[in-house]
Amino acid sequence: MTIEFTDWPQDRAQRYRDAGYWIDQPLTEILHSRCQAQPQALAIICGERRFTYGELDTLSSILASRLAEQGLGQGDTALVQLPNVAEFYIVLFALLKAGIVPLNALFSHRRLELTAYAKQIVPKLLIASREHEVFRDDAYVQAFAEVGAAPAVTLLLGESDPAASLAHWIETPGSQPVAYAPTAADQVALFQLSGGSTGIPKLIPRTHNDYHYNARACADVCALNAHTRFLCAVPAAHNFLLSSPGALGVFHAGGCVVMAASPEPLSCFALVEQHEVNTVALVPSAVALWLQAAPAHRDKLQSLAYLQVGGAVFADSLARQVPGVLGCQLQQVFGMAEGLINYTRLDDSDEQIFTTQGRPVSPDDEIKIVDEQGVPVAPGEPGMLATRGPYTFCGYYKAPEQNASAFDAEGFYYSGDLVVLTPSGDLRVVGRIKDQINRGGEKVASEEIENLLVLHPEVTHAGLVAMPDEALGEKSCAFVVSRNPSLKAPALRRHLMELGIAEYKLPDRIRLIEAMPLTAVGKIDKKQLRHLVSVENTRTWLQTRLRQLIEDSEELDPEENLIFYGLDSLQVMKLAAELKARGIEVSFEELASTPTLASWWALVEARQKAA
C-alpha cells in the first residue's frame, strides 16, 4: 500500500532520470552513504550531546525496527511534532527507513492545527513532546479521537512510562530485529506544509526522488562540505531548514548540524563561538535582531562565513548591513515547500545579492511570469510566478479543487508570488496575490483567522489584512464588526487562543468598525481594509513626527494652528518631503495653507485613497 499523490508525467520523469536528477534512491541513502564514508564524523550537536553518523544510523534503525514490530510500515503515516532537538532527525530517518510517511508539524502549532493535520492523514503513529502544552496531560487523546484520528501508537519525548517514551524506544532494541524497508524512490517520502491562504495548510507530498535532488542541488549551490557547521535555529521542520539546503543538505555533504532552541541572538552567538559554526539560515526578522545585537559580540562570530536568509522578503537596507555587521557573506533564498528554490550565488555581485532573491538551482527548473490572463509579461515587469521542474510537486494531497486552481494545463504551479525578472536573470519578489500574511517567515492564512473570529458570539463579520512592519516584514490587522460596541481586543485574542491556534496567528492589531466594506459581489473588500490600515499608520506617523519636530510634550489639538506650537516653514517643507518619500504626494503649499493636524489628516487620507 502506498500514499496517493499526483505523479509527474512520464516524459518529464524520464527526462529527470536521464539528466541524473532522480537517482531512484530513498532519502535514507543520504545517511547510508555518510556511514559508509565517515561513520565517526559528527552529524549532530545538541546541547551537551554529540551524535556521529554511525550513531544516528544505529539509533534510527532501532526505532525503525521497534515500529515495524508494532506492525507499522509502508502505507502508514505519522504526525510528528518535536522541538529543535537531535531526536527530530533520529525520528525522521527511522520513519523513512520503515516506510512510514511523516508530517512534521511546527512546534508552534497547537490543538487546532494538530487535529486538522491528523484528520487529513489519519496517522497510525503520533510522536510529540510532553514539553508542548497539548501533550502535557492526556486530554489530547480525546481531541484526536473526536476527529476520527486516534493513533495506534503514541511516543512522547519527556514521557516517564517506558511503554510510551520516545527516548526508551530509541535507546532500547526489541527482543529481536524486525525487517523494515523504505517506500520506493518514486513514492511519497514525507509531507510538507503549504503556506496556504485558505485556512489550515494544505499538504504537499514530496517523493524520495524529488526531495533527494532538492537537498543535493541546494547543497551544491551553497558549497556545503564535510567542514560545514550549520546552525539550526529556525524550526527544524521548516522546509527551509530541512532541505534548502538545511539539515539534509548538510548530511549529504558530510557536515554537522548544531541545534539551537531558537534564533535568539545571544544564545546563538554562544553556540557559534563554542562550535565554530560557519553557516546559518535565518528568516529576516531574526536577522534584524542579530544585526542589533552583533556589534557588542562581534568576537563570538569570527567563524561565521555564510548567512542564508529566506522565508520572507529581505529588505535591501538590512541586506546591505550583513557583511559589515556580521562579518559574513549573505546568500538570499527564495523558495517554497511546493518545490522551486532560488539562490543568489556565492560569486554574484553585491547588487545581485542585496537586491534580488536569486535564480533557480536546477537547469530544468522552468519558470514563466505572466499577467492575470496568463500572457507572459515584458522583462522587468511584475507578474505572477508559475513553475514546474524536477523537484516541484504536481498536486496537493487529496485537494482536487485547490489543484484545479493552482496548476495550469501545462502542469505549471502558480505560487501566488508576484515577481520581476531582472536583467541579470535573477528574480525579485515584489508582492503576493494570495490572501496571506507573511509574519517573519510564518504564514498566516487570512481566511482561517476570519472564520475563527466570527465564531465569537458577538462578532458578525471579520476581515484580516497585512500591514507593514520593519522587524517582521508584515503583521496582521483584524477588522471586526460586533454586536457589542464595547468588545475589546483582549477578549477576541483570548477567544482565538481558546480555540487552540498557534500564537503567531493572533492578530497584531484589532479594530472595531461599524460596517464591513464589501465588493460589488458581496465579498470583503480587502483593498479598502488595507487602505484603512495605511490611513491609520500614516495618521500615527504624522502625529508622532510632528511631536518630534515641535519638541512639545503636550497632546496636539487636531484643530489648533500648528504655528502656535512652534512649527516653522522649514519643518513643513521637511514634512512634505518625508510624506513624498512615503508615497504620498503633498506639496509644501498645501500643507502651509491649512496648518492643522485635522486638515493634514484629511488631505493625506484623500491622497492615499486616490492613489
From Swiss-Prot:
InterPro entries: ACP-like_sf (IPR036736), AMP-bd_C (IPR025110), AMP-bd_C_sf (IPR045851), AMP-binding_CS (IPR020845), AMP-dep_synth/lig_dom (IPR000873), ANL_N_sf (IPR042099), ATP-dep_AMP-bd_enzyme (IPR050237), DHB_AMP_lig (IPR011963). It catalyses: salicylate + holo-[ACP] + ATP = salicyl-[ACP] + AMP + diphosphate. GO terms for molecular function: 2,3-dihydroxybenzoate--[aryl-carrier protein] ligase. Its EC number is 6.2.1.61. Disulfide bonds: none annotated. Residues 533-608 form the Carrier domain. The modification O-(pantetheine 4'-phosphoryl)serine is found at S569. Its cofactor is pantetheine 4'-phosphate. The keyword Ribonucleoprotein does not apply. It comes from the Bacteria. Pathway: Siderophore biosynthesis; pseudomonine biosynthesis. Involved in the biosynthesis of the siderophore pseudomonine. Specifically adenylates salicylate and loads it onto its peptidyl carrier domain, via a thioester linkage to the phosphopanthetheine moiety. Belongs to the ATP-dependent AMP-binding enzyme family. This is Pseudomonine synthase PmsE. It comes from Pseudomonas entomophila (strain L48).
